[in-house]
Amino acid sequence: MELRNSTLGSGFILVGILNDSGSPELLYATFTILYMLALTSNGLLLLAITIEARLHMPMYLLLGQLSLMDLLFTSVVTPKALADFLRRENTISFGGCALQMFLALTMGSAEDLLLAFMAYDRYVAICHPLKYMTLMSPRVCWIMVATSWILASLIAIGHTMYTMHLPFCVSWEIRHLLCEIPPLLKLACADTSRYELIIYVTGVTFLLLPISAIVASYTLVLFTVLRMPSNEGRKKALVTCSSHLIVVGMFYGAATFMYVLPSSFHSPKQDNIISVFYTIVTPALNPLIYSLRNKEVMRALRRVLGKYILLAHSTL
């Protein structure tokens, strides 16, 4: 097949789920609501964790970072998808595609690592409460956050540079919601089998190892919770952990389907649907899952909203 020059002037056409659906208007309205929900809920959660002194704890610092990652992740993808649908213009420049891929990989990989650190935080809090402030000191917590961002950025840079240097064929139509590695490999006019093996190894390392750590952490947590004499303490621990497990299941399930399962196991249409879960649905639901099931967060949100409502009334 004829090759295309990979220059900044060359572009791709993103054929996302909005362009490949029988009811695009309904999907557009749903995505708009979910995006506004993600902006509002993650923004409020970040605000509450930042200004409420009672939430200046390792658990809530990690939760704030999760909200920040979700906010950035969905903003990398959703606004462009919605704007393209309205304009009936689905093109993305070569440079724009590379940037979107880098940012999406960074946010996704950082969240992947952060969720494992959050599981460790819950393990320490429940299984070793007397050592909590030593094992999860502010310094340790910030090291976890920095590790998530730095490792994710390095992985994203490497994969983005390699993928975007592949020779692409004349067909530039990406049947996907965003510029991502699997759909772009389908456009490459080169043998990508070795690179697909590298992606598989990276996927196993960055997805299955954190999942294993999370499962191990919560297995130990479960044994500890079952031995708790207080029903109230047992209930509080289970509520906190179940919230995290719901988030973990949604995120890792979709990411594993996309990056670990062989491409022969899923079609472009299935990939399109799955990408919606980790770019739009999960960022909108994560803060609700955490805040609605956490009394401390709900109290902090009410205090923050109350302050701003009073401030707004006093300025009128």
From Swiss-Prot:
Extracellular topological segments: 1-30, 78-97, 161-205, 266-271
InterPro entries: GPCR_Rhodpsn, GPCR_Rhodpsn_7TM, Olfact_rcpt
Keyword RNA-binding set for record: no
Top-rank taxon, per record: Eukaryota
Disulfide feature: C97-C179
GO molecular function, one term: olfactory receptor activity
Sites where a glycan is attached: N5, N19
Membrane-topology annotation of the record: Multi-pass membrane protein
Location within or outside the cell: Cell membrane
CDD domains, per database record: 7tmA_OR2T-like
SUPFAM superfamilies per record: Family A G protein-coupled receptor-like
Cytoplasmic side: 52-56, 119-139, 227-244, 293-316
GO cellular component, one term: plasma membrane
Residues passing through the membrane, by range: 31-51, 57-77, 98-118, 140-160, 206-226, 245-265, 272-292
Gene Ontology biological process terms, A to Z: detection of chemical stimulus involved in sensory perception of smell
Annotated keywords: Cell membrane, Disulfide bond, G-protein coupled receptor, Glycoprotein, Membrane, Olfaction, Receptor, Sensory transduction, Transducer, Transmembrane, Transmembrane helix
Main location: membrane
PANTHER family referenced in this protein's UniProt entry, alphabetically: OLFACTORY RECEPTOR
UniProt record similarity statement: Belongs to the G-protein coupled receptor 1 family.
Task of the protein: Odorant receptor.
Name under which the protein is recorded: Olfactory receptor 2AG2
Name of encoding gene: OR2AG2
